[in-house]
A protein has these predicted regions:
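Short glycine/proline- and aromatic-enriched beta-strand/turn motifs that initiate or cap beta-hairpins
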Residues: 24-100, 270, 276-278
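Predominantly the C-terminal beta-signal and adjacent terminal strand-loop region
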Residues: 27, 228-279
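Short loop/turn motifs that connect adjacent beta-strands in outer-membrane beta-barrel proteins
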Residues: 39-47, 135-149, 201-205, 236-239
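Residues on the lipid-exposed face of transmembrane beta-strands in outer-membrane beta-barrel proteins
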Residues: 51-53, 86-92, 128-132, 154-156, ...
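Outer-membrane beta-barrel translocator domains and adjoining extracellular loop/strand segments
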Residues: 62-68, 109-114, 143, 162-172, ...
Length: 279
């Protein structure tokens, strides 16, 4: 039978490996691009820009070796002291450059008997992609807009966790070996390729479908990473769009060798919400 202290250690291990705790990443190619599609190609400006704050209200399922950890969105946000997510995108004709930043400052204190554990994590996830529109078939009629477009993308996701763990005993006398202080930085880069499809549903509604795959075990990257999302983007005005949808991502990582090999499988999923300012 596992003690609460065992569960605490499992949660810390989960945080070490799950570099997408608070939300990792809403797909930047779908957030707020509607205004480009709602404009006739003949009338589009060569350059367009957008800034899109968003939130992924995700829960997580994590398998670390033979142990299984399940955490809801409320569980994850209870560990988050500060965080934000933002997409910035520049488009030139059929070319796009987008960067999706997630920053989170995580931390908590846990106590089991006389043992006190404090942990803090500064987390950065930076997803940068180049994209090219390979299909652009939108039909602009007098009263309707219909059609679809597809982009191919390639880029990298940079994952970084600065981790600090302090363990001490609540004791009136000094205990040899305590306090224990652990500080470590864990980071790696995943190469990713993908595509996103945008389908016009009406003059003010755009459906987006997106998928990416990467990692491939290159260097210390994920053995395999993939994600899928769908979004509905609503045109509010010429400068503002609102996006709502759902996303799921999976990541498989390995650490150690031989008997010390630890395999981790992370599944993160949930609804996402965002707004975009189109310039």
């Amino acid at each position: 039978m596992k003690t609460n202290f065992d569960k605490i250690l499992l949660i810390i291990v989960f945080i070490f490996y799950n570099t997408n705790i608070f939300s990792q990443e809403k797909d930047e190619d779908d957030a707020g691009t509607a205004n480009t599609e709602f404009i006739d190609k003949k009338e589009r400006k060569p350059w367009s820009f957008k800034l899109a704050p968003y939130a992924w209200l995700a829960g997580t399922s994590t398998d670390v070796g033979s142990e299984k950890i399940r955490q809801s969105f409320n569980d994850l946000t209870s560990l988050t002291n500060f965080g934000f997510q933002m997409v910035a995108q520049a488009r030139y004709k059929k070319w796009t450059l987008s960067s999706n930043l997630t920053y989170a400052k995580l931390g908590d204190q846990m106590k089991e008997g006389r043992m006190i554990i404090d942990f803090a994590i500064d987390q950065i996830i930076l997803d940068t992609k180049f994209g090219y529109t390979i299909i652009d078939k939108f039909d602009f009629g007098d009263d309707i807009i219909r059609g679809w477009a597809m982009d191919a993308t390639i880029g990298v996701i940079y994952w970084s966790n600065d981790i600090a763990v302090d363990a001490d005993l609540d004791s009136p006398i000094e205990i040899p070996g305590f306090p224990v202080n652990i500080s470590e930085k864990m980071d790696y880069v995943d190469l990713v390729v993908g595509t996103n499809i945008r389908i016009i549903l009406s003059k003010s509604v755009l459906l987006g479908l997106s998928g990416n795959i990467g990692g491939f075990g290159i260097g210390n990257s994920s053995k395999l990473y993939w994600d899928f999302s769908f979004t509905n983007t609503f045109k509010v005005s010429k400068l503002l769009t609102v996006t709502a949808g759902y996303k799921s991502f999976n990541a498989k990582t390995e650490s150690g060798e031989g008997e010390d090999l630890v395999k981790t499988h992370i599944k993160t999923f949930g609804p996402l919400l965002g707004v975009a300012f189109n310039l």
